[in-house]
Every structure is written in C-alpha cells, then in structure tokens.
C-alpha cells in the first residue's frame, strides 16, 4: 500500500486520503492513483507506503534472488494470529553462476505488527521507551543453506509422515528431492547452525534425482491426498508421474502424459480426488487429467484457448470446485469445474497490465485469492464482495468505476515479482519473492 508523496496523497485501493498540508485548490480534487493506469506521477511526487493499511509488514534479503519458495508447515499450531509470528520458508536461488546457487531454509521470527505513529504529545521519556521497544521488536532471520549446482526454478515442500522434503526443479534439467529435517533443526539453534555451515552443508545431497525430462521445467506439485505422489512438467511439453516406493525412493513413469503442444507451466493436484490433476501450458490451454488411464489417454477435459497466450499459473481451490488461472494476457480467470466442458470461465478480472506470475486461493476463506504480476503488483480479491450503491465512491472519483468490485487491495513496492503463497497456519499472511527480495505482510483487508 502506497501513497503519492507530495501535495496530494492517495492510497492504492482507491480510497482518497486527506491532503497532508497546503492549498490544493489550484490542483482540483484529489485523484485516485491506479497502478499501471495513472494518473502519472508528476515531478517531485513519489509513492510512499501507507502503514495503516498493513497489520504486519516485513522484508528480507538472502543475497541472490529466489525465483521460487514454499512455506514449510510447522508444529506451532494453526490459526495463529497473535504477534510476534514465526514462520519457515524453503527457497532456491537464481545466482549469476551455476555453482553459486543454494537451497535454503529460512526461519523468520519475532515478526511484530506495524507500529502506530507516535502521538504529538509524547515526551522524552516515552521516546526512550520507544527506542528500547524498537530494539526488542527487530525481526530475526536464521538461514541454513546447501550448495546446489544450477539455478532453482521451482521449490515445493511436502511432509512424508514426519519427514519434510523439498522437490526442486533445476535449470540444469534435473528434478531432485532433498530431506529438510536437518535444515529445520539447525535454524533453531545458533551454535548448531554455525557447526552445520562449517562441517555439514557441503556434504548434503539429494535423496533422489530424476534426469529423464531431457530439459528444464517449472511445473511441480505434491499430491495433498496421497503421501509422496509427485507430478513434474517440463518445457518440452511432457508431464511425468512419480510414485513413492518402499525404502524412501520413487518410481518415475517414463511415459509422459500426452496432450500439451508447448511448455507445461504449472500443475495442480485435485484436493478431493486422488487421481485427478490439472495442468496449464504455453499453448494457451488448461487440461484436466486422470492418472488411472494410460498417459496417452489420460486427458479427460480441455479448454483449448483458456487465455490469449501462455497460461502461466493455476491454483485449485481447497474449498470450492474452482480453478484459478493467470496468463500472459494479464487476466485472472475463475473456472467452475462443474462447467469446465463449456470452455468459458465464470469470472474474468483484468487488473494486471502485464503477465500474471503467481496465483493462490486463500487456505481458509473460500472466496479470497491473491495474484502477482510482472507489473510489480500483488492484488488481493474476494469473490463475495459487491459494491455498495449508496457508498458514493464512484461519484466521488469516476476512476473507481473501472475497478473490479472484488478487488480488495493492491500492494506495490516490489521489483519483478515471481511467486506468492498464503501461510496455511497464519490466516491472512502473505509471503512473496521478487528480485527485490522476500516480503511478508498482512493487510487490513484480509
């Protein structure tokens, strides 16, 4: 959430804010700033963050940027809202050289909420207390890493019983599985972390590796219903099924699922059926598959032109029979799987003005989702929202008429956004990765 820094001050959600000071009559009424649409910033103006729009906001840097990450479910409990928060991320870097890459475990803790501005009547003693409080409120980051040859395109984490593992797509064309238990242990204790980085990290190797894709890829998803079952898709249009075997290994079916004609961009297992999954592709299609059929005949449903161009990302709702997709056309589309044969989405939203890079349904609220785009925006949406005809916002600023009613919030300030995830155990908490680093935030809207 940002506002113009200058004589006018507006917030990104389209709610005009009072001018800070000065005579604005010569400028006419305040205008809402719509990211990617204007009005353009004038000389001397810049966007500044409106901290009152955030319950919590933190940023983190890891050196080389991360193209992908996943949130690691922990044993700290569900529905955590009490601050400060603790969370764990597994991420992979995109470094300048292949040998400089790392698979990382991040422990972020002491994450406090945004601090209210000081009152006008605060005295010197209160200011000293605030300084002490500020020191205690500093966020903390522990980072354990292991060498990885090649940039990491995608990371997805799953628990195999009590064992956390990460599936890792490498730009070198391999898909690897890494055990994460040791990394989770050492980020809890500074001395253990120092010993690990000194003596152990170079020896950590994947517990399984598959090089049968004949090229790199990005699509990867663990089944939420069948422990250890994995799908991987590559830029050569092939999708392979991984089946866990006794002894902690996998059998990878060498027969690819046949249907797409270009790169497979994303994969999502059904949250309700063990054998069904969805895929999207640079061929503009979305397909629904059933692994009980032979790979050459497993495609059951197809929407051939789901977007005008590449379909980059999909997310299958855990609570409703809805599939969410985002494409190079900047559109977000909702597909009712009960009507998928019709080939038409039940809703289309066009807020992003560049390719959509990530989408995800809220894990607890069935109508809420988030998306990120190459236009440096993260948007939050709620399908249940309808504009109040008596509110008068549109009359106050006609620019609001173009905003979708379901748009809750627009977050900016990141550069080259790549991926976002809701925290499954901390309601409303979003984490994103971009060239500018990680951002952890919760807005007043969700």
UniProtKB/Swiss-Prot annotation:
Phosphoserine occurs at which residues? Answer: 119, 122, 344
Where the WD repeats fall, as residue ranges, is 54-110, 163-204, 205-250, 251-297, 298-343, 344-405, 406-442
This chain's function reads: Histone binding-protein that regulates chromatin dynamics and minichromosome maintenance (MCM) loading at replication origins, possibly by promoting chromatin openness.
Q: Where is this region: Disordered?
A: 1-38, 110-141
- This chain's protein is named Glutamate-rich WD repeat-containing protein 1
Q: Which PANTHER family match?
A: GLUTAMATE-RICH WD REPEAT-CONTAINING PROTEIN 1
Keyword Transmembrane helix among record annotations: no
Modification type Phosphothreonine: residues: 10
Where on the tree of life does the source sit, at the highest rank? Eukaryota
Report biased composition (Acidic residues) as residue ranges.
121-135
């Amino acid at each position: 959430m940002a506002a113009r820094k200058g004589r006018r001050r507006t917030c990104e959600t389209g709610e005009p804010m009072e001018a800070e000071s000065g005579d604005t009559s010569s400028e006419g009424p305040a205008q809402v700033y719509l990211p990617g649409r204007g009005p353009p910033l004038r000389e001397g103006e810049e966007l500044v963050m409106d901290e009152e729009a955030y319950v919590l906001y933190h940023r983190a840097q890891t050196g080389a940027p991360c193209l992908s990450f996943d949130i690691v479910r922990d044993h700290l409990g569900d529905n955590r809202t009490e601050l400060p928060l603790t969370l764990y991320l597994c991420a992979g870097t995109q470094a300048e050289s292949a040998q400089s890459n790392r698979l990382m475990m991040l422990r972020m803790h002491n994450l406090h909420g945004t601090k209210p501005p000081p009152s006008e009547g605060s005295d010197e003693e209160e200011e000293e207390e605030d300084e002490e409080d500020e020191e205690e409120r500093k966020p903390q980051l522990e980072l354990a890493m292991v060498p990885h040859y090649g940039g990491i395109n995608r990371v997805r984490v799953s628990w195999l019983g009590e064992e956390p593992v990460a599936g890792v797509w490498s730009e070198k064309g391999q898909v690897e599985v890494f055990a994460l238990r040791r990394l989770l242990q050492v980020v809890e204790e500074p001395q253990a972390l120092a010993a690990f980085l000194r003596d152990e990290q170079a020896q950590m190797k994947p517990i399984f590796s598959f090089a049968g894709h004949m090229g790199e890829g990005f699509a990867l998803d663990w089944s939420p219903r069948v422990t250890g079952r994995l799908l991987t898709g590559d830029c050569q249009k092939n999708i392979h099924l991984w089946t866990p075997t006794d002894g902690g290994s996998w059998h990878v079916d060498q027969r690819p699922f046949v249907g797409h004609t270009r790169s497979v961009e994303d994969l999502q297992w059904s949250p309700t059926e063990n054998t069904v999954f969805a895929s999207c592709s640079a061929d503009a299609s979305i397909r629904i598959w059933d692994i009980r059929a032979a790979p050459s005949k497993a495609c059951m449903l197809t929407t051939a032109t789901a977007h005008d161009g590449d379909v980059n990302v999909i997310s299958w709702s855990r609570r409703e029979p809805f599939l969410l997709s985002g494409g190079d056309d900047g559109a977000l589309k909702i597909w009712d799987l009960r009507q998928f044969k019709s080939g038409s989405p039940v809703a289309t939203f066009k807020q992003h003005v560049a390719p959509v890079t990530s989408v995800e349904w809220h894990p607890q609220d069935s109508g809420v989702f988030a998306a990120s785009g190459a236009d440096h925006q993260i948007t939050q949406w709620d399908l249940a929202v309808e504009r109040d005809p008596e509110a008068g916002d549109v009359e106050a600023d006609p620019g609001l008429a173009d905003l979708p009613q379901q748009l809750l919030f627009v977050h900016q300030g990141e550069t080259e956004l790549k991926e976002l995830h809701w925290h499954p155990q901390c309601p409303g908490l979003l984490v994103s990765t971009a060239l500018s680093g990680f951002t952890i935030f919760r807005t007043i809207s969700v």
